[in-house]
């Protein structure tokens, strides 16, 4: 073997060794990178479980409501355990968020505010009907020209043109009370007001505010008015207000006293806001004679509007509204139908049009005829007979309508 060939062999082995070591180094580096990533992931997971253990072992906080802010470091709160407390404010809590009514968390000893909790509403309040922008306007309400004028002046005008009242130096009504028989359009009027003012429509039924627990009804009233202010401009419509605003009696059960507390909270809320605010209260009842006089005094529900059963002209307008989109045969005489329906409410007239549509469907037709309308009037009137019972006024109106139907037939 020559010297040159021996040197070449050693050089080849030396280069081959370098190549193998380079591969091993690359593999080891890849393993290091992989293990480093795994270590970071495991560290994050460890921190997560440490935090979870800390949460599980940490004592619970006490919920409280701020009553008064004394200074940046001391606040009066009402704790969920009962008593009012003067507590300190932890360093990390923003003092600007501590306002009367704010919900806060106290430490387990109840001596320090450690956090300000987000505001919330009772589930009953959130479940109430809230319609952001109702698609109902005054043109959709028939036979109530005088009532529309009164409610426009009392509610719509102060919201749209408050400067008129400021210039005159007068206050518009804070609340409007609608009263009249069922189905005459009280809720429809309230929705039309919300539609005309582009306001949020909040509908509350009085019976929902009657609660068996002491203080619950009053708390619900406070939360409803708070929701109305946050959604302003808003129309707060309280239906069946007689459930919480009936006349007070000296002798009553604990349930009666709770209803009275709810009514007093309602009066306090009405007394507490500016008449020119963008929150207007409209209430409705079928029994004005049951309402407590304190509710009706000036400064509260001081505009009382009767919504009666529609007149002949009103019934004709209502029928025109409900048949606006219906396919009617040329022989349908709405004026004759209006004469047949004396004593009918707006809801009854809508039921007549719907029932006439069903009559047409049963015949296999797609057009409503006069005969369909007359049969529908008879069916709705029969239902009114059962519903009217022994009321002599309703019976007299129905008898008059029966005589008219007999004449037409």
Curated annotation (Swiss-Prot):
PROSITE patterns: AAA. ATP binds at residues 183-188, 322. Residues 1-22 are annotated as: Disordered. One of its GO terms (biological process) is proteasomal protein catabolic process. Its main location: cytoplasm. The keyword Nucleotide-binding applies. It is found in: Cytoplasm. One of its GO terms (molecular function) is ATP hydrolysis activity. GO terms for cellular component: cytoplasm; proteasome-activating nucleotidase complex. The keyword Cytoplasm applies. Residues 23-58 form a coiled coil. Keywords: ATP-binding, Chaperone, Coiled coil, Cytoplasm, Nucleotide-binding, Proteasome. It comes from the Archaea. It holds the Pfam family AAA. Consists of three main regions, an N-terminal coiled-coil domain that may assist in substrate recognition, an interdomain involved in PAN hexamerization, and a C-terminal ATPase domain of the AAA type. ATPase which is responsible for recognizing, binding, unfolding and translocation of substrate proteins into the archaeal 20S proteasome core particle. Is essential for opening the gate of the 20S proteasome via an interaction with its C-terminus, thereby allowing substrate entry and access to the site of proteolysis. Thus, the C-termini of the proteasomal ATPase function like a 'key in a lock' to induce gate opening and therefore regulate proteolysis. NCBIfam families: PRK03992.1, proteasome-activating nucleotidase. Homohexamer. The hexameric complex has a two-ring architecture resembling a top hat that caps the 20S proteasome core at one or both ends. Upon ATP-binding, the C-terminus of PAN interacts with the alpha-rings of the proteasome core by binding to the intersubunit pockets. Belongs to the AAA ATPase family. HAMAP family: PAN. This is Proteasome-activating nucleotidase. It comes from Aeropyrum pernix (strain ATCC 700893 / DSM 11879 / JCM 9820 / NBRC 100138 / K1).
